Amino acid sequence: MSILALVEDRPTPKEVYNWKIYLLAAVASFTSCMIGYDSAFIGTTLALSSFREEFGFSTMSKTAVNLVSANIVSCYQAGAFFGAFFAYPIGHFWGRKWGLLFAGTIFTLGAGLMLGANGDRGLGLLYGGRVLAGLGVGAGSNITPIYISEMAPPSIRGRLVGVYELGWQIGGLVGFWINYGVSETLAPSHKQWIIPFAVQLIPSGLLLIGAVFLKESPRWLFSRGRREDAIKNLCWIRQLPADHIYMIEEIGAVDQALEEQRTTIGLGFWKPFKAAGTNKKVMYRLFLGSMLFFWQNGSGINAINYYSPTVFKSIGLHGANTSMFSTGIFGVVKTVVTFVWLLYLIDRVGRRLLLLIGAAGAAVCLLIVGAYIKIADPASNPTQEMTGGGIAAMFFFYLYTVFYTPSWNGTPWVMNSEMFEPNMRSLAQACAAASNWLWNFLISRFTPQMFAKMEYGVWFFFASLMLLSIVFVFFLVPETKGIPLESMDVLFESKPIWRAHATVLAKLREDEEQFRHDIEESGYSKTGEQQVEHVSEDLPKV
């Protein structure tokens, strides 16, 4: 079987897997490039001697430096927390496209504000810009996964939402290496540390340009009663005429799902809030979505992303450039493994099994690194060169990255984008994204203090959380690969959880065979014409 072989819930025409759907996902994923770059560059920028000298870090106590560094990093997450919620009304009333434009605009303003900071003006502009940039990425982290999942065919939905994760890793790769580059090529100066801040404008500028040409989500258009526009956009994205049986099935499934919503949750702005507080099924899925991000942050990945020099120093690496180089290798490993996850694992292996395997492997690696630090205590016993034990610890650190990246890094984003009804999706994604940024904030705010007080215990702490996540996923999280968005209710109601996917997929295939049989019996062409007669004049020629 080919590495790109797909698992389909029904026969899918080859036209559906076209370049347009990948292009739309790629353009929308410039939001994740912004997030990835911002998450990666800030830690090593704060470690640059030019930055520390300009803002007087050398005159501060170690405790004060840790506090200021934590504040600079964490105010970004605080902004992102609120940005995730601000995106909900924009996405609901004005659509996914305008939500992406809003995210790009706010982020660009924040990035521009940061460029005004210097030693004379102090850190105020940096704090303000980080908060604004956080608002932008919080909004983007809400809107982008929804936009992509609503356009994607079920068989490649994981792969397309995975493009969002790939953008995150590409941005991170640039962010991890840029400070190594400026430290090697530029003398310590204002220019040396301001360049990494200026590069933030590149992904946000590309997003603003590209989003202008994006097609609005057909499912959002259906939910707003703009049926003709919805079918027109869906035909453009699928590259199929509206009377094709695949289109009839998809439009029928969306209509049926919207009708069920009208009679259960409702389609108004406030209806999802009511459901979130009273509907046990919705509350349960919100709990699952938020907890996935709790366990993701419990892996310790963001402690590494934001404070990689501190992390590598705890293992025994010394020297700013050496830490930056090791951080760059960390970024390369994450990016390469993300490609494997995107092309092969997410839609072939699935979400649930990846989470289980990734948590087990990552936990073992973290325990080994923690045990080495406990025994060797490299911080108290520094050496000119790394010992054999230190090299082994670095190996298991990178092996941890190999286990974590194709499992917990992007999979929670994929699952949260697909497991809610259309009218709940914006609010649910806002809650999920906000929970991610809340846990992210706590990790980024207290990591320096944790390493100062707990030392090797930090590694054991994160390993313990990874082990607990295995129990959570096994008993509570169903597999969602290949299941249409409109069938998620049935999936989450199926028991036991570990057999739900096979049960629902078998039922979908049975219903598909019956549907096609009924269509053929009633006259396929006639049925197709009746389904789309009222919009045929507005359809594009594809």
Swiss-Prot record:
Domain of life per record: Eukaryota
Biased composition regions of type Basic and acidic residues, renumbered to the chain: 531-542
GO biological process: carbohydrate transport; quinate metabolic process
Recorded GO CC terms: membrane; plasma membrane
Membrane-related topology note: Multi-pass membrane protein
Residue stretches spanning the membrane: 23-43, 75-95, 98-118, 131-151, 160-180, 194-214, 286-306, 326-346, 353-373, 388-408, 457-477
Gene Ontology MF annotations: carbohydrate:proton symporter activity
Extracellular side: 44-74, 119-130, 181-193, 307-325, 374-387, 478-542
This protein's UniProt keywords: Cell membrane, Membrane, Quinate metabolism, Transmembrane, Transmembrane helix, Transport, Ubl conjugation
Region (Disordered) location: 523-542
Record's subcellular location: Cell membrane
InterPro entries: MFS_dom, MFS_sugar_transport-like, MFS_Sugar_Transporters, MFS_trans_sf, Sugar/inositol_transpt, Sugar_transporter_CS
Cytoplasmic side: 1-22, 96-97, 152-159, 215-285, 347-352, 409-456
Post-translational modification summary for this protein: Ubiquitinated. Deubiquitinated by creB, probably to control its activity or amount.
Keyword Transmembrane helix: yes
SUPFAM superfamilies: MFS general substrate transporter
PROSITE patterns: MFS, SUGAR_TRANSPORT_1, SUGAR_TRANSPORT_2
UniProt family annotation: Belongs to the major facilitator superfamily. Sugar transporter (TC 2.A.1.1) family.
Family annotation (PANTHER family): MAJOR FACILITATOR SUPERFAMILY (MFS) PROFILE DOMAIN-CONTAINING PROTEIN-RELATED (PTHR48022:SF34), PLASTIDIC GLUCOSE TRANSPORTER 4 (PTHR48022)
Subunit structure: Interacts with creB.
Name of protein: Probable quinate permease
Organism: Aspergillus fumigatus (strain ATCC MYA-4609 / CBS 101355 / FGSC A1100 / Af293)
Gene this chain is encoded by: qutD
